[in-house]
Amino acid sequence: MIANSSTDVSVADQKFLNVAKSNQIDPDAVPISRLDSEGHSIFAEWRPKRPFLRREDGIFLVLRADHIFLLGTDPRTRQIETELMLNRGVKAGAVFDFIDHSMLFSNGETHGKRRSGLSKAFSFRMVEALRPEIAKITECLWDDLQKVDDFNFTEMYASQLPALTIASVLGLPSEDTPFFTRLVYKVSRCLSPSWRDEEFEEIEASAIELQDYVRSVIADSGRRMRDDFLSRYLKAVREAGTLSPIEEIMQLMLIILAGSDTTRTAMVMVTALALQNPALWSSLRGNQSYVAAAVEEGLRFEPPVGSFPRLALKDIDLDGYVLPKGSLLALSVMSGLRDEKHYEHPQLFDVGRQQMRWHLGFGAGVHRCLGETLARIELQEGLRTLLRRAPNLAVVGDWPRMMGHGGIRRATDMMVKLSFDL
């Protein structure tokens, strides 16, 4: 048994999660700002009442887990392509090219050819073989961190672990990680509905810079032709003749982006949630066989991805409510992972709970996350090393808060020190 494995975060979340305010909203015109700051409480109120809400920008937020699973693979829907960008008035440029040419925002044969070259490299067997290398990365990070007292956990551990891992997988120079992570965290804002028009110039500039970096990496790999993932991938897709040069760039750009940003956020929140309950933290220190369960529950409780987009190809009836043909949908993972039908007392962070067989946070069907296994291993090994090397870790100042409700979410920084003596 895990001692005191559950925490009533519906009360305790005042430390570091979004505190509920009044939910007096129009369910057919919900402000994005309210969803970003009060998402959990809004979803908890409306999920029993109706299967979806409509956001102020016209996008429908699907709230219930069963409907999210259904619509993730339902032939009456498809993955969005450039619709969200066009909806925001973006019709060209580096960000538009990223959306237009990446496997994430494609369907059918186009999606298949863009994904196929990466699928083998991210198979469970291939990725599981990386576990020792990932564990080594965590140890090296703590060799340096144990020399300091107070430090920014988000920047110095949670960010570094996935960046160094993806650099290792792709054969990128480790010294490049500060450069590309800086760009990744700016570009990834385009995968959230919360970016403001005045922010787009910076997002676009960062996308241009990241695209140029990936292009140079591909050129360097072509000159050296080493026996690494990147060289093998480029050789395979070029022999198959399935991808254009811009598609090569965008698939690798997506891997760098997806492999860095979401794991960073998850590492911060899993650690914070475990630290919030000293008895749970002590149990994890004493029996690390519970680490995987803590990671799964952390990904449920505060998923780093708030929703997945789809497009309705026909009118779709959900429990008497109709999603109109042509509607842009956001399948709210954030809501579905707290659906009372599937989770008893979903507002509790409970490491001992039974999870659904397929974790909703990684998507569904042919678009299910390629990096699912890699993310889990990074989080598990990151937490294991943390428990062993920093057993007296303590948060200094404010606990981190999760921000956002759709696409990629963000966690505020977490400052820590290696002692409970504050």
From Swiss-Prot:
Heme binds at C369. The keyword Cytoplasm does not apply. Transmembrane segments: none annotated. PROSITE patterns: CYTOCHROME_P450. Its EC number is 1.14.-.-. InterPro entries: Cyt_P450 (IPR001128), Cyt_P450_B (IPR002397), Cyt_P450_CS (IPR017972), Cyt_P450_sf (IPR036396). GO terms for molecular function: heme binding; iron ion binding; monooxygenase activity; oxidoreductase activity, acting on paired donors, with incorporation or reduction of molecular oxygen. Its cofactor is heme. Not essential for virulence, but may be involved in the detoxification of plant protective agents at the site of wounding. This is Cytochrome P450-pinF1, plant-inducible. The lineage of its organism: Bacteria, Pseudomonadati, Pseudomonadota, Alphaproteobacteria, Hyphomicrobiales.
